[in-house]
Swiss-Prot record:
A motif (EEXXXDL motif) lies at residues 504-510. It comes from Drosophila melanogaster (Fruit fly). Changing residue 549 to H: In strain: MW27. Residues 144-162, 655-676 have a biased composition (Low complexity). Changing residue 600 to E: In mus304-4; induces abnormal bristle morphology, decreased meiotic recombination and arrested embryonic development. Residues 20-40, 90-109, 135-162, 651-681 are annotated as: Disordered. This is ATR-interacting protein mus304. Belongs to the ATRIP family. Changing residue 499 to I: In strain: MW63 and NC306. The keyword DNA repair applies. DNA damage checkpoint protein required for chromosome break repair and for genomic stability during development. It comes from the Eukaryota.
């Protein structure tokens, strides 16, 4: 209804713009009557006629529409008033369409336009609709004429208010627009000023950069010119240097060719002289063997002090007519070929080791390849050992001194640099060290290594043969790295829990030959670990001592010399060499001190385990393990421990001279107590050397610890000391034997005295507990340390000792052919100053 009314209103306004028709929503009160003419008497006649005509036409039209029964516009509640004619339409309607605000009222014209008023009849529709809607209502009573006046005044007030509001609104809008435009202009001015400033700065920077670029281009051009000039100078200098070098190379080549010819001539002459010398020595040896009688055992033992004499026993792996020492050494091509072979096999083994680490399950595929490679290398190793330089009579192992003052750089056995000065066979050492790592990782490979055969020869057999030849060589000192790698390989093979009898023999022979090479202290570190591993295999421990005769050993305490032969006991040789390994009165270097701690710890543990689970050669010596059926065993033991040192020492000396004949008579009271007398009569001193070497090693460890101001290795020294106090208590208190002080008596007593004093002084620092202190107290109160060394020894002992050894060596150096067969009277030895200087005045041999 509102939209329809709005359309009709717009149409009426367009047709008659000058007629002001106000249509408002009717209120609840009844609208005033439409036909009230009282309020319009003051209008003109034309207006009255017009309004009457409009009312009449509206009534007629309302009746017609009523008859039709349709009502299109409901204006029953609306009120239509005609206040006055105005330029534009003024009114308020309720519509949903938004219209612009009405324009301000215009000035009324001075004259009425009747044509415009009566031009169109459409405006009468509004009156007809109004009359039709309002007809059913009851006509109200006529009011006074003041209603028209009130309506006119309200309309005028509304117009005035609307005009004022519109003017104020337009004024405010204009002010806002003007203010907005001014602000916008100011912002644009500021932005323009900033842009002009930035433009100026950019221009300045561009000018500066352009200048810098020009300078850099000039410098670059200048440097390029200098570079080109320097290149030309270098090319000229290089050409000149090449010409000079070519001249010098040509001259050097001529000199080398001349030297090669001269060297070949000298080598030929030298080879000829060696061949003649060999023939001459053979003839001399044959003539001497015819005239010389069988040597006496004593003379045979004394002869071991000379390098040119031997024990008259051939080595199974060497031929007496081996003339390799008199032949010209292999040329450089053969040496290079062998080195390349070792390097090639080393690369293959490293590749196999890497695959084994990546895929441990591939050991089945890699096992034959690794063993085949090892067979080739060991075959070449045996050939290499044959080419070394060694003496003709290979009966006596040489002495290989080692300098404890030189600086060493120990990284790893597999490192490619040299571990020793003038080291040889470095690729072979690296190959064997890598093989040791593989065997330690895979037990199947170590087992296969002992069973694999190459050309009907076992791998370990070839290694033993090569090490035997290497031990007699003059170049053994240059192969200490190789020996250390072989010892590491042996230690890996000994880790196997169950060893076959054949494999035990091979491993023992390999261990023996490695010890007999008199290696460096670094090799002894691995050897001490091997001896610890042997404790798990009783069969190997039984092979340590073979009861070798006395003439297989020579021990010189004054000169620190220890000589032995191929038939010597392994344990005695190992213990004797270990005593001489770290003899030093000055502080060792830190690396050598740590090495001493490692070797000392391993050896003390080995000796202590030997007494905890004693093998046969120790059981035969211990007095508490004699025959159980002998009732006098305890008495014999007490008698033996209570016998004076001079009596037992006399028997020991006589036994060493007369090959046991006098020893049987002197030691007769103790034959029923234990079997040690029989053992000593046979000449083996494995038990004595094992005990004395433990004392010496412990003394060296404590002595070096004191020299290092008790700041380095305290934990290791404490652990060694706690084990050693148990060991020394067993050796010198529980199972004490007088034979321990037969040789080097005062030296051993001196070592023991110093060890006990150091332990007592630093017991807390070494971690001694009550059991250790009790055992230490027993050692201090033992009968072998009745007086300090400076009160017990005679002042002339060192002089007599040295003079006696000089006399023995001087007599041994004499060439005696027939006189050597004369037997020496043992009784004359009792009058010598050497033995009388070993005891106190009241216990002399006289």
């Amino acid at each position: 209804m509102a939209k329809r009314f709005s359309a009709m209103k717009d149409f009426a306004r367009c047709k008659k713009p000058r007629l002001d028709v106000s249509v408002t929503r009717g209120s609840a009160r009844p609208s005033p009557p439409r036909n009230n003419f009282d309020g319009i008497l003051w209008d003109d006649d034309d207006d009255v006629i017009l309004m009457a005509t409009q009312l009449a036409e509206a009534e007629i039209e309302a009746e017609e529409r009523k008859k039709k029964g349709g009502t299109e516009v409901d204006i029953g509640n609306s009120e239509v008033t005609f206040s006055e004619f105005a330029p534009t339409f003024q009114g308020s309607t309720s519509t949903q369409q938004m219209f612009p605000p009405p324009p301000p009222p215009q000035k009324k014209p001075t004259s009425l336009d009747m044509d415009a008023i009566f031009a169109d009849d459409d405006d009468f529709d509004f009156l007809a609709v109004t009359l039709m809607d309002s007809e059913p209502q009851k006509m109200p009573e006529p009011k006074t004429s003041t209603s028209r006046i009130t309506t006119s005044s309200i309309s005028v007030q509304q117009k005035t208010t609307t005009t004022t509001t519109i003017n104020a609104t337009q004024s405010r809008q204009q002010e806002h627009q003007l203010k907005f435009l001014m602000d916008r202009i100011e912002a644009l001015k500021r932005e323009n000023a900033q842009l002009e400033k930035n433009l100026g700065d950019s221009k300045e920077r561009n000018e500066i950069k352009s200048g810098e670029v020009s300078l850099l281009r000039d410098e670059l051009k200048h440097l390029r010119q200098q570079l080109q000039a320097s290149k030309m100078e270098k090319l000229a200098l290089a050409d000149e240097t090449n010409r000079d070098c070519n001249k010098k190379v040509a001259e050097a080549a001529k000199q080398i060719a001349a030297k090669d010819i001269e060297l070949k001539i000298k080598n030929a002459e030298f080879s000829k002289l060696k061949t003649q010398q060999k023939a001459h020595e053979r003839s001399m040896n044959s003539s001497m063997s015819i005239l010389q009688a069988a040597p006496d055992p004593l003379e045979k033992r004394l002869s071991l002090r000379l390098n040119r004499l031997n024990i008259h026993r051939s080595v199974p792996g060497l031929k007496t007519d081996n003339g390799s020492v008199f032949e010209y050494s292999e040329n450089e091509d053969q040496t290079k070929k062998r080195r390349n072979h070792f390097e090639l096999e080393l690369k293959q083994l490293l590749l196999h080791y890497a695959r084994l680490q990546a895929k441990p399950e591939s050991v089945d595929n890699l096992l034959p390849r690794i063993l085949s490679s090892v067979g080739k290398v060991f075959t070449e190793f045996a050939s290499y050992a044959q080419s070394l330089d060694f003496p003709h009579n290979c009966m006596l192992y040489p002495y290989n001194p080692h300098n404890l003052e030189e600086e060493v750089h120990r990284i790893s056995l597999t490192h490619q640099s040299c571990l020793y000065d003038n080291e040889k066979a470095v690729p072979l050492r690296r190959f064997i060290a890598t093989l040791a790592l593989i065997c330690r990782r895979e037990e199947r490979i170590s087992r296969g290594l002992t069973e694999w055969k190459e050309n009907d020869l076992g791998l370990l057999d070839m290694a033993i043969e090569a090490i035997t030849k290497l031990g007699f060589s003059y170049e053994v000192g240059q192969h200490f790295g190789l020996l250390e790698a072989l010892t590491s390989l042996l230690n890996s093979l000994l880790q196997e829990n169950a060893l076959l009898q054949h494999n035990e023999e091979l491993l023992f022979d390999l261990l023996k030959q490695l010890v007999f090479t008199r290696p460096s202290p670094w090799v002894f570190a691995e050897l001490s670990s091997c001896f610890l591993s042997c404790l798990r295999h009783p069969q190997l421990m039984d092979k340590m001592c073979v009861n070798s005769p006395k003439d297989c050993f020579v021990s010189d305490r004054v000169r620190s010399v220890y000589r032995f032969g191929p038939d010597s006991c392994l344990l005695q040789v190992y213990a004797g060499l270990l005593e001489l390994c770290f003899f030093s009165e000055t502080p060792l270097r830190q690396d050598y001190f740590q090495l001493l701690l490692k070797i000392g710890g391993n050896h003390v543990r080995f000796a202590f385990e030997c007494f905890k689970n004693p093998p046969d050669f120790i059981l035969e010596m211990l007095p508490y393990f004699a025959d159980d059926g002998d009732e006098d065993s305890s008495d014999g033991t007490l008698m033996k421990t209570g016998t004076s040192l001079s009596f037992n020492s006399t028997g020991a000396v006589q036994g060493s001279v007369s090959n046991g004949s006098t020893s049987a008579s002197v030691s007769n009271p103790n034959q029923n107590s234990n079997s040690s007398t029989t053992q000593r009569g046979k000449g083996c001193e494995c038990y004595v050397k094992l005990c004395l070497s433990a004392v010496t090693i412990v003394f060296q460890v404590m002595h070096q610890w004191m020299l290092h101001s008790r700041k380095a290795g305290t934990e290791e020294v404490g652990e060694i000391s706690r084990i050693a106090v148990h060991l020394l208590s067993l050796v010198f208190h529980e199972y004490y034997l007088t034979c321990l002080f037969r040789d080097s008596e005062e030296t051993t007593k001196h070592y023991l005295s110093l060890i006990c004093n150091w332990w007592s002084e630093h017991a807390n620092l070494l971690g001694f507990q009550s059991i250790h202190l009790r055992l230490l107290n027993q050692l201090v109160k033992a009968h072998f340390m009745l007086k300090p060394l400076h009160l017990e020894a005679k002042p002339n002992n060192p002089v007599n000792d040295l003079s006696e050894w000089k006399r023995i060596v001087k007599n041994a150096d004499d060439q005696r052919a027939v006189k050597s067969a004369v037997t020496v009277d043992p009784s004359k030895l009792l009058n010598t100053d050497f033995f009388s200087a070993l005891k106190r005045e009241e216990n002399t041999f006289e």
